Design a protein with these regions (language model features):
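Short, well-ordered coil/turn segments that N-cap beta-strands
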Residues: 225-227, 271-275
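Conserved, mostly hydrophobic/aromatic
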Residues: 87, 138, 196, 221, ...
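Hydrophobic faces of well-ordered beta-strands that scaffold small-molecule active sites
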Residues: 192-196, 229, 277-278
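Short proline/glycine-enriched turn/loop motifs at strand-loop junctions of beta-rich domains
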Residues: 88-95
């Protein structure tokens, strides 16, 4: 027969054991006592970050690099024959690709199919089903509503100058950029970084371009002895005044500054002169 006193001692031992296995204070608080009043909030955020890390990496089955490389699978891709489009939308009930190629109307020809057992949707399109420069979006249906969306993995997004509305754009130029500098290894002893913003680095009172930066600013950076440039606001963002902090398309270089080919030319020229690009 277990007495009340024995139960109490047993529970206390369990509590003491659990407390002994937990750090008294998290590292941030140990290093900065002024954070002690906020320790619970900080610990909660840290625990949430670890949870999110596990979710993104499938509890370690893939790496964060694998997750970040999702654009190689998702989005719109040119195949040897035709195109393939994929999107992750687990709560969607229907997805249509709409754009210049079908007069922005929902048609069976451009209706995506859910890949069974996943949250992934896929649509295969014929060679002539779309062309370079076509604008497009997806029309997503879910329980209780629907709406147009820019695909999450779009690699080219442009803004209408009149309406200010963004759309994804098919990007498959007849003559893709050919890299002149095939191999590049930066000098990191030491790494001297020049932080820059393509649009704000020009003398003219306008949004600067990739080409203008390559021709007017890069030579000065080279002359000053830097071996790396870190480009701010390179990912597409709807509000220019946000300095690029309001990212809306993580895999699309901002079209405000020019085309992907012009950005590649800038990077190529930097590499040819020993300049790394972040």
């Amino acid at each position: 027969m277990v007495t009340r006193k024995a139960k109490s001692l047993n529970n206390k031992a369990k509590t003491d054991s659990k407390a002994a296995n937990e750090p008294k204070h998290i590292g941030l608080v140990v290093n900065d006592g002024y954070l002690a009043p906020y320790e619970d909030a900080i610990r909660g955020r840290h625990d949430h970050a670890l949870w999110k890390l596990g979710q993104l990496t499938r509890n370690g089955k893939i790496s964060l690099e694998d997750f970040a490389s999702g654009y190689d699978y998702y989005g719109l891709h040119k195949l040897s024959r035709g195109w393939v489009f994929r999107e992750w939308a687990p709560n969607a009930t229907e997805i249509y690709l709409v754009g210049d190629f079908n007069n922005w109307q929902e048609t069976e020809k451009y209706k995506a199919k859910r890949i069974e057992g996943t949250g992934n949707w896929e649509l295969k399109i014929s060679e002539k089903g779309m062309k370079h420069g076509d604008l497009y979006k997806i029309h997503v249906y879910w329980n209780g509503g629907s709406g147009e969306r820019i695909p999450a993995w779009s690699q080219r997004v442009v803004q209408d100058e009149e309406t200010k509305i963004f759309s994804a754009q098919v990007w498959n130029p007849e003559k893709p950029y050919v890299w002149r500098k095939k191999k590049f290894k930066p000098n990191k002893s030491p790494l001297l970084i020049y932080e820059c913003h393509i649009g704000m680095s020009q003398d003219a009172e306008k949004v600067g371009t990739y080409t203008e930066f390559k021709e007017n600013v890069l030579p000065r950076i080279i002359e000053d002895g830097y071996n790396c440039i870190q480009i701010m606001a390179i990912q597409e963002h709807p509000y220019y005044g946000s300095f690029g902090y309001h990212v809306s398309s993580f895999f699309a270089a901002s079209s405000r500054f020019g085309t992907p080919e012009e950005l590649k030319s800038l990077i190529d020229e930097a590499h040819r002169n020993g300049i790394a690009v972040i």
